[in-house]
């Protein structure tokens, strides 16, 4: 068999920014570079939202952190690679969480009887103010980072708080986990409690200092520009953040059309905008050459959907949070049919935990409710589609991630379902579907990120 040619240009797709180390690799961290190896087991991965590939007792080949493909028989040219045989276990791509809030991890599962804006004022903002205390931040973020390390998540886009030093601490801790993450210092200079609101110049100065402090510091962790949402950011702040975005070529994350009250509020604040997303687009932070994630997207008008498609915006679908905070049910079937980039977000603490498998199950369930109660022309999501959203769908924001196709960074989970007893044999697809609904971190035997074994 002829040796495959690998394109080294895709080997470190980490959402880099100007000032990041070359290929996202810090010179201090070079000893952690991935090796060549083969994993054997029952392998499942997505090619697209409708094509789930399952290979029984297949071989997954890794060359310098990159997938060289999945094979039923191991090609001779890889025969000398170290091989780990995982027997009857499932091997699937690592999961991507496109939206969660690290400082909210401490109150997950609380305040779920409130709607969004009340929940922010009574739960979220008081908790986030505590991160001005570095001792508290260290205790809380250490718990978060450790639990993320042992979860099924291999890549994540994370909101921190307005506090620069605590944000840098969070990035330090996430770097130690070995996961690939984008972390953002939050910007907010209006309509916020006194304990959290920044002066516009202060917000910009601290953001610039944050970017300077972390330059060249990490291999796996990169910054993402994080204006919380339009209601908490003045026009001046947004205009100046756009200049920073252009200077550092930063990706952007924020919230969009989560709640009807929020949408009305944005219309009051930005009466010149056609729709919520148009306000972001006005400031140059809505795709169109800028890698952008918008979380929720529950109530988009048709023009907003078209703009997201035209601009290549990523949707972070957060089904559990949208349910807990009574926000609504996002039209994910529409997003898939329109070809809009879509992945999943746990949205801790709007979501009660960090399980992206749980987010897959929630996405299926709420799509059934939308189909039955709102629009019977929009078919519910299938298990294959939900799995795609949690792997390749969201992984695309990081470049070539979330699949075992040749040329993709190799993020993998080894799943052990021996404890999930069944009276008869199940197909690989059936076993995977069970993991979506009833698995937890105890079923993960091994975890790899870009070819490096985490545990």
Protein language model features and the residues they cover:
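Metal-coordinating catalytic core of metallo-dependent amide/deamination hydrolases
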Residues: 165-298
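His/Asp/Glu-enriched, well-ordered alpha-helical/loop segment
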Residues: 282-288, 333-421
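N-terminal metal-binding scaffold of metallo-dependent hydrolase/deaminase domains
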Residues: 23-78, 89-90
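Alpha-helical scaffold segments that flank or form the walls of functional sites
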Residues: 108-179, 203-217
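C-terminal cap of metal-dependent C-N hydrolases
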Residues: 48, 409-455
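Active-site gating loops and adjacent loop-to-helix segments of metal-dependent hydrolytic enzymes
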Residues: 106-139, 185, 190-200, 259-289, ...
């Amino acid at each position: 068999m002829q040796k495959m040619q690998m394109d080294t240009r895709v080997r470190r797709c980490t959402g880099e920014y100007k000032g990041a180390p070359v290929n996202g690799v810090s010179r201090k961290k070079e000893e952690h570079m991935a090796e060549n190896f083969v994993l054997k087991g029952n392998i499942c991965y997505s090619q697209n939202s409708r094509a789930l590939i399952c290979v029984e007792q297949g071989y997954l080949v890794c060359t310098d952190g990159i997938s060289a493909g999945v094979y039923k028989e191991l090609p001779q040219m890889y025969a000398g690679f170290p091989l780990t045989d995982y027997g009857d276990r499932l091997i699937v791509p690592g999961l991507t969480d496109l939206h969660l809030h690290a400082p909210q991890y401490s109150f997950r599962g609380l305040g779920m009887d409130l709607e969004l804006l009340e929940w922010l004022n009574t739960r979220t903002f008081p908790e986030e103010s505590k991160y001005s205390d570095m001792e508290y931040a260290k205790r809380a973020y250490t718990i978060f980072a450790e639990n993320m390390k042992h979860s099924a998540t291999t890549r994540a886009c994370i909101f921190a708080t307005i506090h620069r030093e605590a944000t840098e601490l969070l990035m330090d801790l996430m770097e130690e986990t070995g996961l690939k993450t984008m972390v953002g210092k939050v910007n907010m200079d209006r309509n916020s409690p006194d304990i959290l609101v920044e002066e516009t110049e202060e917000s910009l100065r601290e953001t610039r200092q944050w970017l300077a402090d972390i330059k060249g510091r990490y291999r796996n962790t990169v910054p993402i520009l994080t204006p919380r949402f339009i209601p908490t950011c003045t026009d001046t702040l947004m205009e100046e953040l756009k200049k920073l975005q252009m200077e550092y070529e930063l990706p952007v994350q924020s919230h969009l059309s989560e709640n009807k009250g929020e949408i009305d509020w944005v219309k009051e604040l930005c009466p010149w905008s056609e729709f919520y997303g148009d306000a972001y687009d006005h400031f140059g932070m809505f795709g169109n050459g800028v890698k952008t994630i918008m979380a929720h997207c529950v109530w988009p008008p048709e023009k907003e959907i078209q703009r997201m498609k035209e601009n290549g915006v990523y949707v972070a679908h957060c089904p559990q949070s949208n349910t807990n905070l009574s926000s609504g049910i996002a039209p994910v079937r529409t997003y898939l049919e329109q070809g809009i980039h879509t992945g999943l977000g746990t949205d801790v603490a709007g979501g009660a935990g960090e399980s992206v498998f749980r987010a897959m199950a929630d996405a299926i369930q709420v799509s059934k409710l939308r189909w039955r109660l709102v629009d019977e022309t929009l078919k519910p999501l299938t298990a294959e589609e939900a799995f795609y959203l949690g792997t390749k769908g969201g992984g695309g924001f990081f470049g070539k991630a979330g699949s075992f196709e040749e040329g993709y960074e190799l993020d993998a989970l080894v799943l052990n379902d021996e404890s999930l007893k069944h009276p008869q044999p199940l197909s690989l697809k059936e076993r995977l579907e069970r993991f979506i609904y009833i698995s937890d971190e105890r079923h993960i035997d091994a975890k790899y990120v870009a070819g490096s074994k985490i545990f």
